[in-house]
């Protein structure tokens, strides 16, 4: 919840407290705490800490071997930790780096995982806009918007609203008008 509120320092503090006695935690819980701490670090503008935490979590990933039914996204989701890194990079304003990671992640995510693919594409489009590549952002947004309309995903809609904000510098340009037309069906009735 502190991440959603943009309180990076509180997220880092909470995760540090959770990891204070990390040896007593199963690897899956340590990975979850580390990736959440990375999100907090991204909110605080600390790229080095983001990379350090995601890299540490990645080294723990092979140790996740329990059969508990909760918290298995780190094993089940292709490129899970790179999804977290790309999200953090996007939050840090590292558009080119985030975009490259989203390309890698999307190559791993099956077409059947439509909601995840749509969210990731919306984030990739936002990364392109942040990297001052508005044409690329709009091209990616076309696919994400189609999925958003078909699935009615609120999460995807939120990501596309973020894209819309990031594209404001081009709102009066042809590319901005194209984006508004593409996103129209997504935001109808919202």
Question: Where do the PLM segments sit?
Answer:
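Conserved binding/catalytic microenvironments
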Residues: 1-190
């Amino acid at each position: 919840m502190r991440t959603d509120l943009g309180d990076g320092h509180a997220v880092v503090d909470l995760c540090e407290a959770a990891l204070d006695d990390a040896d007593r935690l199963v690897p899956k819980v340590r990975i979850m705490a580390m990736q959440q701490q990375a999100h907090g670090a991204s909110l605080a503008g600390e790229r080095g800490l983001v990379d350090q935490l995601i890299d540490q979590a990645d080294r723990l990933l092979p140790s996740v071997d329990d059969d508990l039914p909760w918290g298995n996204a780190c094993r089940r989701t292709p490129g899970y930790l790179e999804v977290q890194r790309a999200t953090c990079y996007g939050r840090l304003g590292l558009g080119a780096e985030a975009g490259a990671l989203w390309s890698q992640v999307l190559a791993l995510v099956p077409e059947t995982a439509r909601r995840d693919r749509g969210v990731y594409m919306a984030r990739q489009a936002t990364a392109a806009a942040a990297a001052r590549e508005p044409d690329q952002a709009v091209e990616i947004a076309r696919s994400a918007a189609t999925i958003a309309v078909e699935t009615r995903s609120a999460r995807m809609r939120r990501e596309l609203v973020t894209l819309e904000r990031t594209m404001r510098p081009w709102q009066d340009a042809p590319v901005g008008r194209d984006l508004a037309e593409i996103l129209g069906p997504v935001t109808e009735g919202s």
